[in-house]
């Protein structure tokens, strides 16, 4: 059941918020506010080291000596947190690895940081998501 409430905003802040709504193609302010609240709760789950889901993406140099082995070894060290991986050959030199992860936020961050720190990793990103259990 949805509950209605009102908020007051400075004109400038409301203008910025309305621009955000237009850029993201929200149908209305309410859905945009719900989304912002959910995102805040997801961040809180990560800060509190709760069970979370995430996606680690890596772009790395295919030719870097022993890098693929190190990536695989580190994933095996965290095997209980890895749901799935996908490996894409982007071109002759670069690979993209996408790793779907779950578990305590601290463990997921440790894995993501470990992978990002490997020599030959050109770019890495951790998309922090919720399990969805607390977002009802």
Swiss-Prot record:
Any single biological process term in GO: response to nickel cation
Cofactor: Ni(2+)
NCBIfam families: PRK00630.1, PRK01002.1, PRK02967.1, PRK04460.1
PANTHER family: NICKEL-RESPONSIVE REGULATOR
Record flagged with keyword Metal-binding: yes
UniProt entry tagged with the keyword Chaperone: no
Binding site for Ni(2+): 76, 87, 89, 95
A molecular function GO annotation: DNA binding
Pfam families (alphabetical): NikR_C (PF08753), RHH_1 (PF01402)
Lineage: Bacteria, Pseudomonadati, Thermodesulfobacteriota, Desulfobulbia, Desulfobulbales
Domain of life where this protein originates: Bacteria
Gene3D superfamilies in the cross-refs: ACT-like. Chain A, domain 2, Met repressor-like
Keywords, comma-separated and alphabetical: DNA-binding, Metal-binding, Nickel, Transcription, Transcription regulation
Organism (species): Desulfotalea psychrophila (strain LSv54 / DSM 12343)
InterPro entries hit by this protein: Acetolactate_synth/TF_NikR_C, ACT-like_dom_sf, Arc_rbn_hlx_hlx, CopG, CopG/NikR_regulator, Ni_resp_reg_NikR, Ribbon_hlx_hlx, TF_NikR_Ni-bd_C
Role this protein plays: Transcriptional regulator.
UniProt xrefs under HAMAP family: NikR
This protein's name: Putative nickel-responsive regulator
